[in-house]
Curated annotation (Swiss-Prot):
Organism: Paraburkholderia xenovorans (strain LB400)
Annotated Acidic residues bias: 346-365
Cellular component terms (Gene Ontology): cytoplasm; excinuclease repair complex
Region (Disordered): 345-386
Domain UVR: residue ranges: 208-243
Main location: cytoplasm
Ranges of residues in domain GIY-YIG: 21-99
PANTHER family associated with the record: UVRABC SYSTEM PROTEIN C, UVRC/OXIDOREDUCTASE
Pfam families (UniProt xref): GIY-YIG (PF01541), HHH_5 (PF14520), UVR (PF02151), UvrC_RNaseH (PF22920), UvrC_RNaseH_dom (PF08459)
Protein name: UvrABC system protein C
Family, as annotated: Belongs to the UvrC family.
UniProt superkingdom: Bacteria
Protein purpose: The UvrABC repair system catalyzes the recognition and processing of DNA lesions. UvrC both incises the 5' and 3' sides of the lesion. The N-terminal half is responsible for the 3' incision and the C-terminal half is responsible for the 5' incision.
Length: 734
């Protein structure tokens, strides 16, 4: 890997002369060491040179180039390997000018265990070879629906192995015809294995084979005069027919297909992923790039070259995440990322002397015998003409599928921006991967449905955003605040939760960019106070939250002042006209909401006064009569009169939303802590007593009561327990 040393003045020519004509990955850094962009290249020297030798770069790329202070490159053996490395680096480094999809939690699977009598179960996580996995499914609901179908048709067990091994009579599921009760040998191992095999074929989309086998089995029982068994198989066929009839509109000839639709609307982009597993359409999931309002035009859905606001967009990684209340999307410079994606000079533009013999007309898949509805996409030199949709789709495919299972068919609304991505997917999957851009028949219907769902999701998101922005504006107007950019309004809300003084926890939730930022939520374990003292708990959490922030800000201000004095000594013209006030620094909120009345607000005022913070940002939310929503009163710490808002107030709706989220976050944490405490033995809390010593104590005294009743001498007689440790244990238990 090449790592040129960073200097005060970046010299591109010196760096470019050292670059090889080999495939690899390049990274641009700014003066602070932050990664600006990660890209791949067939020829590193030509690709990187294109940024510094071209005279007609777009304004956005030119702006990025001016920030480059260092270039690093990594040579790979092939372009496919470079694509994999590029994808990994984008995920790890989250560069400002790359489109980044935030890793969502793993998709759910339906698992058939490797037990003698396999159990079917809902599963998330890494897969192994001991069990069978079917999926992934787009949602937990899709998995559970499939489990219910398999219970109704094949009657496979769902109980834990520990329950299965200890049952002496069938459970309720057997009585209602949802399990064949292998736990009590109500079915033979051979027959149960046949049901498992049929269930596997059903999940793989081979329903016809299952029906044929069941029909043959029914006739065989009838010919042997085993009419009860024949009737049972007939009922099984009837259940399966009912299921297939109910899902006739969803079932196609394909086994596994993913449908990817990209839609730009109202300044936002949505990627809608629909999944077909075993021929059944299992639903879809929408992903949205955050903060692209200024990057796309409302009318055209494309980038607006004249929008100068892009240069000042907020910094941070671009995050495509499912929009939820309290989502974890970080502030992002998506405008820059999307602009760079569109305006980036084509990789092969400098390679006019290479690949002159390439011919168009190859289908975008591996192998021969492509489906008749396969897109006639051709290997492209440079970027696709699909605009930003193709760029976003390529980013999604790379970050969603590389390293994960790839279905044999991808139906897409736009062609990926580069051919190499498809080649890498094929190499990784080990089977043919067909990318269809103009599907026919059922696949076409699926794509149209995915595009429609993407538009609906975008319309819903835009409507919710408009409502949320209106609430933010109403709150600032109500509080008499002047805020030039409402997206930068940051609200933090605190709540205290405990059960009769037990497991006291404080929560802090954050509202920023017109939505809850759950990745910035924090819980604080409150200790060293009288149980149930909410005032002391509030003092502790506010002090812990803001004390370090203020101290760090003071240190930063001192460093800046020293630098200014040094510069002023060298050049008196640089001396500041007047000393500026020391800011609190960090990520201070604009408003701090306190869930409580005058008492809690007074405690907060005292803490803020001690820390030198503005008490004007403190707002208490006191519950009204009967604790009914809509009767809350806002209490201020700076002497303003309490303010009662009407039930229909948009400002009150926002305050209630944030307050309720703080309460939810606090109470869930408190319950988890309380449950953990109650399930933990007192011996686990003893200092100096690990697992082995704890086991010896329990073996000697028979349990916790015996340990508590033991004297110091009895404790010291246990192997590994010294006299000093025995005295310490005795003191902690009494």
């Amino acid at each position: 890997m090449t790592e040129p040393e960073a200097t005060d003045v970046f010299e591109p020519k010196k760096v470019l002369t050292q670059l090889p004509h080999l495939p690899g990955v390049y990274r641009y850094y700014d003066t602070h060491g932050a990664v600006l962009y990660v890209g791949k290249a067939r020829d590193l020297k030509k690709r990187v040179s294109s940024y510094f030798t071209k005279t007609q770069l777009s304004p956005r790329i030119a702006m990025m180039v001016t920030r480059i202070a260092r270039v690093e490159t990594t040579v790979t053996r092939s372009e496919a390997e470079a694509l994999l490395l590029e994808n990994n680096l984008i995920k790890a480094l989250a560069p400002r000018y790359n489109i980044l999809f935030r890793d969502d939690k793993s998709y759910p699977y339906l698992k058939l265990t490797g037990h003698k009598f396999p159990r079917m179960a809902y599963y998330r996580g890494a897969v192994d070879r001991k069990n069978q996995y079917f999926g992934p499914f787009p949602s937990a609901w899709a998995v559970r629906e499939s489990i219910q179908i398999l219970q109704r048709v094949f009657q496979l067990r769902t109980c834990e192995d520990s329950v299965f091994n200890n049952r002496t009579r069938p459970c309720l599921l057997h009585q209602i015809g949802r399990c064949t009760a292998p736990c009590v040998a109500a079915i033979s191992e051979e027959d149960y294995a046949r049901d498992v095999a049929n269930a596997s074929r059903f999940l793989l989309g081979r329903q016809g084979e299952v029906m044929s086998e069941l029909e043959q089995k029914m006739h065989a029982f009838a010919s042997e005069l085993k009419f009860e068994q024949a009737a049972a198989v007939r009922n099984q066929m009837s259940s399966l027919s009912t299921v297939l009839h109910q899902q006739a509109i969803e079932v196609g000839s394909d086994s596994d297909v993913d449908i990817l639709a990209v839609v730009a609307l109202g300044g936002r982009v949505c990627v809608n992923l629909a999944m077909v597993r075993g021929g059944r359409h299992l639903g879809d999931k929408a992903y949205f790039p955050a903060h692209v309002e200024s990057a796309l035009t409302v009318d055209e859905g494309g980038l607006e070259d004249g929008d100068e606001r892009l240069a000042d967009a907020a910094t941070g990684p671009v995050s495509l995440a499912e929009e939820e209340v309290g989502g974890e999307a970080e502030p992002a410079d998506t405008a820059d990322a999307l602009a760079i994606a569109r305006d980036m000079p084509p990789e092969d533009e400098q390679d006019e002397d290479e690949d002159e013999d390439e011919q168009d007309g190859e289908p975008e898949e591996a192998g021969s015998g492509a489906d008749s509805d396969s897109d006639s996409a051709k290997p492209r030199k440079g970027r696709a003409t699909g605009g930003i949709e193709s760029e976003v789709l390529e980013a999604f495919i790379a970050q969603h599928y590389l390293g994960n299972r790839v279905p044999p068919v991808l139906v897409v609304s736009h062609a990926p921006a580069t051919r190499e991505l498809v080649d890498v997917l094929i190499e990784q999957a080990g089977h043919k991967v067909t990318v269809l851009r103009q599907p026919q028949g059922q696949r076409r219907a699926w794509l149209v449905m995915a595009e429609q769902n993407a538009r609906l999701a975008l319309a819903r998101l835009l409507s919710e955003q408009g409502s949320q922005q209106a609430r933010t504006r109403a709150l600032t107007d109500t509080l008499g605040m002047e805020c030039d950019d409402l997206a930068h309004l940051r609200i933090e809300c605190f709540d205290i939760s405990h059960t009769m003084g037990e497991a006291t926890q404080a929560s802090c939730v954050v509202y920023h960019h017109h939505k809850m930022q759950s990745s910035e939520y924090r819980r604080y374990n409150i200790t060293g106070i009288t149980p149930g003292d909410d005032y002391a708990a509030m003092r502790q959490v506010l002090t812990r939250r803001y004390e370090k922030m203020v101290a760090q800000a003071a240190a930063n201000a001192a460093d800046e002042a020293a630098e200014l004095q040094s510069d002023a000594a060298a050049d008196p013209s640089l001396a500041p006209d007047a000393a500026e006030p020391v800011a609190a620094g960090g990520v201070l909120p604009t408003i701090v909401l306190i869930d409580g009345g005058k008492g809690q607000v007074e405690i907060a005022r005292q803490v803020f006064t001690e820390l030198g913070l503005d008490t004007g940002m403190l707002v208490g939310v006191a519950k009204g009569e009967g604790r009914k929503v809509g009767l809350e009163t806002l209490i201020f710490a700076d002497g303003r009169a309490p303010l009662e808002l009407g039930k229909e107030s948009a400002a009150l709706m926002l305050v209630a939303q944030i307050r309720d989220e703080a309460h939810r976050f606090a109470i869930t944490g408190m319950r988890a802590k309380r449950g953990k405490t109650r399930q933990t033995s007192r011996l686990e809390e003893l200092e100096g007593v690990g697992a082995k010593r704890r086991q010896r104590l329990l073996a000697r005294f028979g349990g916790l009561r015996g340990v508590v009743a033991a004297s110091v001498e009895d404790l010291a007689s246990v192997e590994g327990i010294s006299q000093a440790l025995a005295e310490q244990i005795y003191r902690q238990l009494h």
